[in-house]
């Protein structure tokens, strides 16, 4: 599963809400909010960042992991096995039908609760019927 233009679509208010659950010092939240709204210089031009998260910023990888941890917690709560790297995620299911159902059920959480967009062109259900132990093949 791929999240479409992740850094460009992170909802700042949702991120601040998630951070506020853990960070009780309003001054820290205020500093992070100012960081998110400070803007970026891209191709020699200043661009405002009023909605999204600045890509390439020093805090952005940490903040993106905090935001995506909400997805991880939800997948774990639902009992799924998964691997995520940045804005890409693989969810492992026992059957194709189960995988299709899982995808159908997790998209509303991602888009409705986290306000992120699933890239349906890059997201697919794949079925792996047999896994070969690579160590057994080594002579």
Indicate residue ranges for each PLM-predicted region.
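Conserved polymerase palm-domain catalytic core
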Residues: 1-131
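Short, low-order "capping/linker" segments at domain edges
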Residues: 132-139
């Amino acid at each position: 599963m791929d999240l479409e233009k992740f850094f460009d679509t992170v909802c700042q208010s949702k991120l601040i809400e998630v951070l506020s659950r853990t960070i009780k010092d309003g001054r820290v939240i205020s500093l992070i909010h100012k960081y998110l709204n400070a803007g970026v210089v891209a191709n020699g031009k200043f661009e405002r960042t009023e909605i999204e998260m600045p890509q390439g910023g020093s805090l952005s990888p940490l903040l993106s992991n905090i935001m995506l941890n909400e997805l991880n917690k939800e997948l774990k709560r639902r009992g799924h096995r998964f691997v995520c790297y940045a804005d890409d995620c693989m969810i492992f299911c026992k059957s194709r039908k189960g995988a299709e159902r899982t995808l159908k059920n997790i998209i509303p959480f991602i888009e409705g609760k986290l306000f992120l967009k699933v890239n349906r062109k890059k997201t697919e259900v794949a079925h792996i019927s047999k896994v070969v132990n690579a160590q057994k093949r080594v002579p």
